[in-house]
Amino acid sequence: MAQRQFFGLTYNFYGQPAPLFDLNDLQELAGCYARPWTSRFSHLAISTGSLPVWSARYPSVASRNIIVNTLLGAHLNPFAGGQVTSHQGITWRDPVLSSLAPVPAIQPPPVWAVAENVPLDSNNYPTYVLNLSSMWPINQDVHIMTMWALSDQGPIYHLEVPVDPMPAATTAALMAYIGVPIAHLAQTAYRFAGQLPQSPDSTMVSTIRWLSAIWFGSLTGRLNRSRTCNGFYFEFAKPALNPDQAVLKWNDGARAAPPAAAQSSYMRCISPHWQHQIVEVAGALMSQSVTAVTGLPALIDEATLPAWSQGVANLTGNGQGVVPCLDYNPVPMAAARHLQWRQDGLITAAQEAQLNNDYTAYALTIERHLTAMLVANPIAAGRMPIQPFNAADFGQAGQTAAAVALAQAMFV
């Protein structure tokens, strides 16, 4: 049975007095006469090659998601124990929050004095559970917004690998996706999770959960064509050609053994590179499409999270039973991936060095692009297409080594 409640958190204002979007965003992303739900995926077409591409008002791969999150957070007061309200002359068209519309001329709803970091609980709005089928997409987008809002770095996502082997039905389902890029797989997962109330133990949920783990195992290099998960792995393009691409592959060769114990962890990219990497944004969205259906398996350890994410009911905490959130940087992660490829005999030492040089150059291009776009889009102007960062953030190693070790424990 589908879960009948959810919990969430609205987006941070990053020191500004109001949500960071404008009326043009309402028209371009959600539309005052269209549903704002399940509208996250056009951003994945921004970067299709090895170089970042300027796209006017949405200058990074993550920009549209960031704006959608800030926009939704400004209109979710019913889930914070309040009424259906308006903000900037816009309100919900009906009680099931199907679409946004201009405030009606007669008896307009009260204006909400919007706030950042507002805890949300579907139990506060009884209309949700009474109209679960029609309002289900709200659960998905609130969940994704929350997993981004809890972090001041990259979005948080969950990974797990059980001790039991992959079910036969899941293996059969995965076969249909061989040759499909990560962006398309994430889009499939997002559309599946948001269409109707889903059962947490369905074959499709299992398929997406395994896809997320296989993607992460391949990101670290642990999974490759010489060591697969039941035959599956993601193949990454050469950095000099298109480093922002990963395609599901299958190989009838050596396979990783199940872990000695079930593995579970929350993850996030700690350096700003994630904002302009399809593999990072798509990988996170794919995993979040699972936990939108199943709910979080445990509280997220708040140890490395920002102050506004401390002790958020049903989401974060500390002490016994919490699951850690490992931070990683894609540059040393790529180096670990290339090292594993060499150790597995897939490339030579000279090729490893060249791959590392190419990836470092690619990462520097992203750094320069995002830095320029942050200057060109100051949040003091009232809009946040680029999430704020400091120059030193690009060099943070975080817990990359621990993340790699986790993949090794997942796929023995």
UniProtKB/Swiss-Prot annotation:
Domain of life here? Viruses
Location in the cell = Virion
Gene3D superfamilies, A to Z: 1.10.287.1520
Which Pfam family, giving just one, matches this sequence? Sigma_1_2
What GO terms fall under cellular component here? viral intermediate capsid
Q: Which InterPro entries did the record assign?
A: Sigma_1_2_reovir
User: Which of UniProt's keywords are assigned here?
Assistant: Capsid protein, Intermediate capsid protein, Virion
Chief localisation class: virion
Q: Which family does it belong to?
A: Belongs to the reoviridae clamp protein family.
**Description of how the protein assembles with itself and partners:** Interacts with capsid proteins VP3, VP5 and VP7.
Q: What is the role of the protein in this entry?
A: Located at the interface of the incomplete T=13 outer capsid and the pseudo T=2 inner capsid, 120 VP6 subunits clamp and stabilizes the inner capsid shell.
In its UniProt entry, what is this protein called? Clamp protein VP6
What's the name of its gene? S8
